[in-house]
């Protein structure tokens, strides 16, 4: 649920092609996963790994991706200072195959299309909230997104996940969601009472930081 397969693919390609552009890395990693491995995935994980930062990705019908950075580097530093304090990630301990969840979404195509249209509209509202520094609204929109996401698949959530989600809302979370395909993995919450939420949740807390640069090659030795 943390984009590990996309990050792994981008990292391997960057090791093979150390001078490659982020665009090449993202496109090639996506092509390998979709066309060669036949995984029913999107493009966001590969592009996030290649480019870094917080971006809006607009995917055209022909597969071309337009990338719009949310902030300049100076603005980015101010943004992540808030988000890294107010976004809290927990591991549910529940594991699932992302392909299994994504397959059920494809089988429910009509419902899936409707929720994706709603999610697309929500994306621009989220962008505006972050641009304007309306962080609480951002948290509320996370909750709205989770309500749409649950409609995509009958195995997106389960009673245990729903119980943890409600517990978080009762202990300072404004909104949240399962990240990734769903069905398990990690829960991400926005809160203005970080310590209260961490103390209340019976799950492993995973600290994290944002990255602005994307995939990098670390040179170690004269022959690289």
Question: Model regions: which residues?
Answer:
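A generic structural signal for short coil/turn motifs at secondary-structure boundaries
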Residues: 1-2, 151
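DPxDG-like acidic metal-binding loop motif
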Residues: 2-22
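C-terminal nucleotide
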Residues: 18-22, 27-40, 44-177, 188-224
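Conserved glycine-rich beta-strand-loop-beta hairpin in the small C-terminal domain of fold type I
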Residues: 185
